[in-house]
Amino acid sequence: MNYKSKETLGIIFAIIAYFSFSILDAIQKSAVLYYSIFQLLFIKYIFVLLLSILEARRTKNISFYRSNNLKLQIIRSLLSILESGFFVLSFKYLSLANAHSIGALAPIIIVVLSVFILNEKVSIKTWVAIFIGFIGVLIVIRPGSDVFSVKSLIPLIAAFFLGLYQIATKKTTEYDSPEVSLFYSSLVGIFITSIMTFFFWQHINLKSLWFFLPIGIFFSLGIYFQILALKNARASIIQPFHYTLIFWAIIFGFFFYEDIPDLFTILGAIIITTSGIFVINQTSKR
C-alpha cells in the first residue's frame, strides 16, 4: 500500500473512531443520570482490558504486561481517569454541543503544557492562535452573563487533564508499546473505579445492560480505530478530525435530547476549531 493510500485509510479510521466516541457520549449523557460516573468508567476499563489482551495477542506481544516505566504508566492512567470522569460529569449538566465545544480546547492546551513541561518552542503565530482559541471558549461559556454557569468549567477541567494525559502518553511511547499502555490504563482504571464504585453505588438491574454494553463496545471501538488511524497516518493528519466530535454532538444532541445550540456556542465552536487546527498544523511543521 502506497503512502497516500495509507493516509486515506488512516483518515477513514479516524472518522470511524470519533463517530464511535460521539455515540458513546450520547449514551453516557443519559447513563450518568442513573448511574455513578465510577460505574460507567469501570465498565469502560473492563472493555479496554479485553481490548489490550486481544491487541497484544494479534501483535504477538507476549510481554504486554511489562512496563519499562511503571511510575509514568500509573500517572498516565490516573490522568485518564480524571479526564474521562470530568468529561462524563459535564454531560450531566451541559448539552453535548456545549461540552464538546469547550472540551475542544484540549489540543491547544496540549501545546501550552508542552511549552512548560517539555520545554518545546512555540512561534508567535501559534501563541496568537492559542489566545484566539481561549476567546472562543469565553464566547461559549460567557462569564459574567446571566447564562454563565460554573458547571461550564467542568469540560475545561477535563480538557486540562486530557492535555496532561496526552503529554504523558507521548512520553510513554518512548518506553512502552501501545498494548502495554492500554493494559496499564485498564488495570489502574479498574482498580481505582472499583474502589470508588463501592462508595458511589447505584442499583443495577438487567435493564442496565442497555447502557453498559453499548458504552463498553463504542468506547473500545473508538480506541481501536484510533490506534489503527495513528498506525496509518501521522498524528498531525489525524488530530484535526477530533473536531468532528462537535459536529456529531450537535446532531445527536438535537435528535436525542432536543438541544439546539445557540449562536454563541456555534460561533465559539468555529473559533476554537479554526484556531485548534491552525495550532496543530503549526506544531506539525516543527
Question: What name fits each language-model region?
Answer:
Residues 87-89, 106-128, 200, 247-266:
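C-terminal transmembrane-helix exit sites in multi-pass transporters
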Residues 1-39, 147-171:
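Glycine-/small-residue-enriched transmembrane alpha-helix faces in small-molecule transporters
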Residues 34-82, 161-164, 184-199:
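Transmembrane alpha-helices of multi-pass small-molecule transport proteins
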Residues 125-141, 264-283:
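Hydrophobic transmembrane alpha-helices of multi-pass small-molecule transport proteins
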Residues 99-105, 172-188, 223-254:
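Helix-helix packing/entry segments at the starts of transmembrane helices
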Residues 9-17, 56, 61-86, 150-158, ...:
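Loop-to-transmembrane-helix transition segments
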Residues 18-22, 77, 81-85, 107-112, ...:
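Hydrophobic/small/kink-forming positions within alpha-helical transmembrane segments
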Residues 8-13, 39-54, 173-219:
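Hydrophobic alpha-helical transmembrane segments of multi-pass integral membrane proteins
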